[in-house]
């Protein structure tokens, strides 16, 4: 379906955005941009029923996931020592699989008779993850990186 092709195009666009537009920005700005693209895509899917807006939403979702996931991958890889990076990579991949499986499983439980509820749940998850990143993860990551360099 074209929707998934638009997500794939969004992933490719996120590579160019990360390389050229966000290359000189902070990690925090990248996460905020990625989460903003995710929120915009979810809101577009929730409030519009046209085919073209669903393709634009898919593009925004691909951009948001691409930027956010790559930033989390950098965090998971840069924290461990050299010989522990394989474990960090495997942990990251397992967390992706658990997240996808949990999303498929809980989507059917939470949204049984109300299919539009999934948009609001996803929006809540995006907001909570951004707040957690801003308040906990970002500070913890940079504190650990300073300890690692000492």
Residue ranges and their predicted role:
Residues 79-115:
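A late C-terminal transmembrane helix in Major Facilitator Superfamily
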Residues 13-28:
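Helix-to-loop junctions at the C-terminal end of transmembrane segments
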Residues 2, 32-33, 87-91:
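Signature of the 12-TM Major Facilitator Superfamily
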Residues 24, 75-80:
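Helix-to-coil boundary motifs at intracellular loop junctions of multi-pass secondary transporters
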Residues 1-10:
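Loop-to-transmembrane helix entry
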Residues 116-150:
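Multi-pass alpha-helical transporter architecture, strongest
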Residues 26-72:
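C-terminal transmembrane helical hairpin of 12-TM major facilitator-type secondary transporters
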């Amino acid at each position: 379906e074209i929707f998934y092709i638009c997500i794939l195009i969004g992933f490719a666009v996120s590579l160019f955005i990360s390389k050229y537009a966000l290359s000189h920005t902070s990690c925090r700005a990248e996460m905020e941009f990625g989460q903003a693209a995710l929120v915009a895509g979810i809101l577009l899917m929730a409030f519009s029923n046209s085919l073209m807006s669903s393709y634009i939403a898919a593009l925004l979702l691909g951009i948001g996931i691409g930027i956010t996931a790559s930033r989390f991958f950098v965090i998971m890889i840069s924290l461990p020592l050299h010989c522990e990076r394989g474990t960090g990579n495997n942990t990251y991949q397992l967390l992706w699989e658990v997240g996808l499986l949990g999303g498929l499983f809980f989507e059917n439980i939470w949204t049984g008779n109300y299919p539009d509820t999934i948009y609001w749940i996803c929006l809540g998850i995006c907001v909570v993850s951004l707040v957690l990143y801003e308040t906990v993860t970002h500070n913890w990551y940079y504190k650990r990186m300073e300890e690692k360099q000492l």
